[in-house]
Swiss-Prot record:
This is Glycogen synthase. Signal peptide: none annotated. HAMAP family: Glycogen_synth. Pathway: Glycan biosynthesis; glycogen biosynthesis. GO terms for molecular function: alpha-1,4-glucan glucosyltransferase (ADP-glucose donor) activity; alpha-1,4-glucan glucosyltransferase (UDP-glucose donor) activity. Keywords: Glycogen biosynthesis, Glycosyltransferase, Transferase. Transmembrane segments: none annotated. It comes from Aliivibrio fischeri (strain ATCC 700601 / ES114) (Vibrio fischeri). It catalyses: [(1->4)-alpha-D-glucosyl](n) + ADP-alpha-D-glucose = [(1->4)-alpha-D-glucosyl](n+1) + ADP + H(+). One of its GO terms (cellular component) is cytosol.
Amino acid sequence: MVTKTLSIVFVASEVDGLIKSGGLADVAKALPKSLKELGHSVQIVMPAYKTIAGRDDAEIILTTQLEHWPHTAYQVRSLNVDGIPVFAIESGDYFERAEMYAENNQAYADNGERFAFFSAATLDLLPKLLNKKPDIIHVNDWHTGLIPYLLKKRYVENEFYHQTRSVLSIHNAVFKGIFHYDEIACLSEFKSHFVPEASISHTHVSMLKAGVQCADKINAVSPNYAKELLTELGSHGMASDFQDRESDLIGILNGCDYSEWNPEKDSYIPKQFKVNRISMVRGKKACKAALQQELSLPQKDVAMYGMVCRLTNQKGIQYLLPILEQFLKNDLQLVIVGTGDPVLATRLTEIAQEHSDKFAFVEAYDNKLAHWVEAGSDFFIMPSEFEPCGLNQIYSMAYGTLPIVREVGGLKDSVNNYDDDIENATGFSFKNPEPMELLLVLMRSLLLYSQNLNEVKRVQLHAMKQDFCWNKAALKYIEMYRTAINS
């Protein structure tokens, strides 16, 4: 039987290669690329933010009107990222701004209206630009959560969308897109202040809830995160909504872009290395020495711990700080790179000054340095409060750096704990959100390093052999798409 080629429209608020603020952008670039490589037709739709509209290669291909909207005119610019066609929706009223979502840590007051417009315009433009009706419209997070709702309500009898199914990916359920009804009353469906699919009170709606209630299929970005979304803690208050859709909820672990994170080809790191023991040992030794020199740490062959993250409680800094000075009493070195909460940054700076022979803190996001940390460290610390998928643990394994993680979200799915399965181990993990539990697992890793370095090297090489390529994840998405189409 010939398997049908799917027509997929991937809708996201950001796409790496064009504009990025977080992991959503990575997925929005990598997944469509893999879907295309597997033979499917893929288009991306996103907003034409100021930096995108100003690009020389962003050609205007459509100027049109959005019916029943106060600011009716919009344009569509055509670009491509990694060979995938991109339709970027341009509206001076909504997207001609310095940033995507906020300025000076203050969300734009009209974000509800902006992304309601984006959702409505997406469904308006597709019949005007596509020759082939889409089989799947794949939307992401709250910014696009109204698209499944509008498909079910506004377009339920529209011939172009008659066979189209929607999929919603949840990258982080903390952000729900909560707005007053009046803020999105430009959509006629919301003028009545009664939309049960989206309502969270008599005055407010959640765009994410609308997507969860109306999408044909929902996926979380790891299997364990899908389970966590069924709980009040894991869903941040939306458990009943996810429980209503449990039969349509699936977890698919994000892939890794090995074109960027590959020690054999990495142009950032001081010495490239291959997936064999001799090359790995030599390469990591050279990268560690270069990292030490770069950060003015003593040139010593001691256990090197790395951490690259936003300085927020989500990333588990609150578990590390209480035990950090106790941990630094041991013969080791630690590098932390990141920006975020100034209070956390100040405390890390103080500790780094007190322990300058062991601990370097760099308050910045430096992509080159991030690669150096991944390559030069022996262990990588990720004690997250929650982590829907996580990527640094996957990058770490690719570089033979053993992740030390809390067993949440995708961290639990991707890291095999040494103390649970020595033979197949790829790192270390702990369960409870307690500083002392983190200290115990850190000391466990340090003990192994000091007593059995050969065993550490064996586990590091095994970690390097793990395969989290995007094509494997894309096959699972295709299976989900076909289930949605056939349901």
